[in-house]
Regions:
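Internal low-complexity, small-residue/proline-rich segments
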Residues: 32-290
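N-terminal single-pass transmembrane signal-anchor helix
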Residues: 4-39, 49
Length: 290
């Protein structure tokens, strides 16, 4: 006679559910870690490509577009000039041929997949998740002669949220600061740079906006500190906490930076201000500890 199959008891069912829950609990952090690593690797590649684009642009001792804090309508932004070297040559040629450019154009290489502030619906900002070192790129500097501290010791690009606390960062903008929509939630447009040492004047402000936090070098041997003591960069701030005067990273483990020699480093959240700002100056003469 065929025996009937014994049904699973309630206790056995609960045990199975508990085991599955434990396994899921063990797997989720691992999956999250894999995803975070993939995002970091993608962002690392983007930053490296941006620096290599600068090297290609600078062939023949060609000077970079000056980031001196002032507006020059006859020139394009640094990141616009790098477009042919970040897989955007067709778009660049169209702009040059027509004399016009579309500020709403999205450049994939300029966006970090980890940047939580990227807004796909914002079609007028030319968002950028990476910022060029304005302090090092003043006065039409040249790759071969403007970095006495060494290209391996000077930051070229740092991570930066594309939006933060009323401010949008744009690869298209040539100005340190402009006003787009006064009174709205994001009424300021800052070009995709950090460490701008120039105060910003705008017709909608009764007083000039303060400059970015930038390095001040003094002493013998030379040491650099931020123009506001103790500040370096922000680690995973909320949108409301974003300080447009500083760089930001979405990675808990530290901020990715591309050096002028093409290498990419991770700066720890607790980095000493003197070390960080010493890496921002191209000719400060500081001794940077590894």
């Amino acid at each position: 006679m065929r025996q009937s199959r014994r049904a699973m008891t309630l206790i056995e069912l609960l045990v199975v559910i508990a085991i599955i829950a434990v396994l899921i609990g063990l797997l989720l952090p691992a999956i999250a870690q894999v995803r975070a690593t993939a995002l970091r690797m993608s962002s690392t590649n983007n930053i490296r490509q941006c620096v290599l684009a600068m090297h290609n642009y600078a062939e023949g001792d060609r000077p970079f577009p000056s980031l001196d804090g002032f507006t020059n309508p006859s020139t394009n932004s640094l990141m616009f000039e790098l477009l042919p070297y970040v897989e955007e040559e067709n778009y660049y040629r169209q702009c040059v041929a027509s004399g016009k450019s579309n500020s709403a154009h999205t450049v994939k290489m300029y966006l970090s997949p980890a940047d939580p502030t990227v807004n796909p619906s914002d079609k007028g900002c030319s968002e950028a998740s990476y910022a060029a070192n304005a302090y090092a790129l003043r006065k039409k500097c040249r790759l071969g002669s403007s970095f006495p501290d060494g290209t391996s010791n000077t930051i070229a690009f740092a991570e930066h949220y594309s939006h933060g606390n009323r401010t949008q960062f744009s690869w298209y903008s040539t100005e340190a600061f402009t006003i787009s929509f006064p009174g709205s939630a994001s009424d300021r447009v800052h070009r995709a740079t950090f460490a701008e040492p120039v105060a910003v004047f705008a017709p909608f402000f009764a007083t000039p906006l303060p400059p970015d936090v930038f390095p001040i070098t003094s002493g013998d041997p030379p040491t650099s500190v931020g123009s506001e003591p103790g500040l370096t960069f922000q680690v995973r701030p909320t949108l409301a906490e974003c300080n447009y005067r500083l760089a930001q990273t979405p990675h808990a483990g530290g901020m990715l930076v591309g050096m002028f020699d093409g290498s990419v480093r991770t700066l720890a959240p607790g980095i000493a201000p003197s070390v960080y700002w010493g890496m921002v100056t191209p000719a400060g003469g500081e001794v940077i500890a590894d």
